[in-house]
């Protein structure tokens, strides 16, 4: 159980409800390893919808529970501890639908978000290109206006959920006037001109592929926000979900720690349990300390956003950077504590070792997170951190409540 000061009763209730998800989700990872990647991905969304988790990704006006970041982080931590595949598919369900929530396009939101909330539709976020990874503004996919339509042409790569998606949010260049002249469009998976051209095999299998847009004619009504607002929507989405990547890292790390505690108490060498040796105790202590520190950064960032912060750039970057790097170290120690079993195909920690690696890359590499944090620190007139502002607001609210006479 997680005991942190950032939760209220609804978060504690959700956390208690999400304990022991392994029987639901862990078999999905095994099925993906056996080649049933798409089937396992679809079943992961069905399970998440059954648990009510997909509603966490959608505003209340469209059948959701309200985009509460602490709840999303609790969900991702619990799901990731059971299955990296299920976490990936669930996370991209949110990543691909959140720009619709941000855009203010009510007609599109009504059409797509209700089906996301109940799991009938699966979303994907199509931004990365062969020459546009960390440099997202280098997008080359074009969207040319033609009457009441836009015609999209380009290639997207490493698009998670691509092979099971019902729709994509596609980012494309609508002008050469500026590097940021990018717009976002909702494109149905079966829309003429959009094709999956190549599945991409990853060290931890999940539904991911390259897609091509060739003379793909999309109604202008499917544009999210104004023309040229795509980068704002993309960065706003990544700011929100980046914190939850840190939560997923905590889930993988917590599972690695649990597996290690059990292993060192049952495994005997030189006549004693491994848990009796000082080096083993030191490793466990370091793992637990790093996990707690990561959780504090993650749920601090989530609380900050839920308390009303408009920007979460610094806090979310810190949470993702530290949590994903700490998780890598924790899982690596778990492999070491398991010895040969730790690198045997089919063992839990071997799977965790493969699943944890991508977290330091997607939604902004660790190197990019460091640049983002440094940029915030070195700004000519750095503002107080979002956490400081949120804390001041919370304190002022509490002080006002304390000043009110008792009924």
Regions found by a protein language model. Give the residues of each.
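Alpha-helical interface subdomain recognition
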Residues: 1-81, 106-108, 115, 119, ...
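N-terminal glycine-rich flavin-associated loop
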Residues: 84-107, 133
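A gly/ser-rich beta-alpha-beta helix-loop segment of oxidoreductase catalytic cores
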Residues: 122-145
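Flexible, small-/acidic-enriched active-site or ligand-binding loops
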Residues: 138, 190-219
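A short core secondary-structure module
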Residues: 153-195
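A short, charged helix-loop
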Residues: 209-236
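Cationic, low-complexity basic patches in intrinsically disordered or flexible, solvent-exposed regions
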Residues: 384, 401
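Short Gly/Ser/Thr- and charged-rich N-terminal loops/segments
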Residues: 386-392, 397
């Amino acid at each position: 159980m997680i005991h942190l000061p950032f939760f209220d009763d609804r978060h504690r209730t959700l956390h208690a409800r999400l304990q022991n998800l392994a029987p639901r989700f862990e078999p999905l990872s095994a099925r993906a390893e056996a080649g049933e990647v798409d089937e396992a991905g679809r079943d992961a969304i069905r399970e998440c919808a059954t648990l009510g988790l997909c509603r966490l990704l959608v505003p209340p006006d469209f059948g959701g529970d309200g985009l509460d970041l602490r709840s999303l982080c609790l969900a991702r931590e619990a799901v990731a501890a059971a299955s990296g595949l299920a976490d990936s598919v669930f996370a991209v369900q949110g990543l691909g639908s959140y720009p619709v929530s941000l855009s203010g396009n009510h007609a599109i939101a009504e059409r797509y978000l209700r089906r996301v909330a109940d799991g009938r539709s699966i979303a994907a976020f199509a931004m990365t290109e062969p020459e546009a990874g960390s440099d997202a503004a280098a997008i080359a996919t074009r969207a040319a206006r033609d009457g009441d339509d836009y015609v999209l042409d380009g290639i997207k790569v490493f698009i998670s959920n691509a092979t099971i998606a019902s729709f994509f949010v596609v980012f494309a260049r609508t002008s050469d006037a500026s590097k940021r002249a990018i717009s976002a469009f909702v494109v149905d998976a079966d829309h003429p001109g959009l094709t999956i051209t190549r599945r991409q095999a990853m060290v931890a299998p999940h539904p991911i592929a390259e897609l091509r847009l060739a003379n793909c004619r999309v109604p202008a009504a499917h544009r999210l926000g104004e023309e040229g607002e795509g980068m704002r929507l993309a960065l706003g989405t990544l700011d929100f979900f980046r914190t939850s990547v840190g939560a997923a890292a905590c889930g993988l790390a917590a599972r690695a720690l649990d597996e290690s505690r059990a292993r060192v108490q049952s495994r005997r060498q030189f006549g004693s349990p491994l848990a009796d040796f000082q080096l083993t105790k030191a490793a466990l202590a370091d793992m637990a300390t790093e996990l707690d520190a990561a959780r504090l950064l993650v749920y601090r960032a989530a609380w900050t956003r839920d308390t009303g912060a408009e920007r979460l750039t610094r806090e979310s970057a810190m949470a993702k950077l530290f949590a994903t790097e700490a998780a890598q170290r924790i899982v690596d120690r778990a492999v070491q504590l398991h010895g040969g079993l730790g690198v045997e195909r089919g063992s839990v920690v071997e799977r965790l070792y493969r699943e944890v690696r991508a977290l330091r890359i997607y939604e902004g590499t660790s190197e990019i997170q460091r640049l983002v944090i440094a940029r915030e620190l070195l700004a000519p007139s750095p503002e107080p951190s979002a956490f400081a502002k949120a804390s001041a607001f919370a304190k002022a609210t509490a002080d006002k409540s304390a000043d009110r006479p008792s009924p």
